[in-house]
């Protein structure tokens, strides 16, 4: 990996993690563990999606690509399901 790619990757990764942890920490808290958990986990899943997409922008080993694609699909599904469930509880 080139120094420039590593710098670009790391800068984006750092921004993603700052955003993710900030959103998790500042998630609205209620008296419901279920709602609190989902409000904290949605940004966590979104972080995993963004991290995976970030890695896919660079030259990575071919074996990692389907793993990252699976993470994106599964975490997007999880976010949709948790958002829908939050509206029901």
Language model features by range: what are they?
Residues 1-89:
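His/Met- and acidic-residue-enriched segments that coordinate or traffic transition-metal cofactors
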């Amino acid at each position: 990996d080139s120094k420039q790619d590593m710098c670009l990757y790391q800068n984006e990764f750092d921004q993603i993690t700052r955003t993710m942890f900030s959103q998790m920490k500042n998630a609205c808290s209620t008296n419901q563990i279920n709602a609190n958990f989902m409000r904290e986990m949605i940004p966590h899943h979104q972080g995993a999606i963004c991290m995976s997409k970030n890695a896919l922008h660079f030259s990575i080993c071919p074996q990692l690509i389907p793993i990252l694609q699976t993470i994106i699909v599964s975490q997007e599904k999880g976010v949709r399901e948790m958002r829908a469930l939050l509206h029901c509880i």
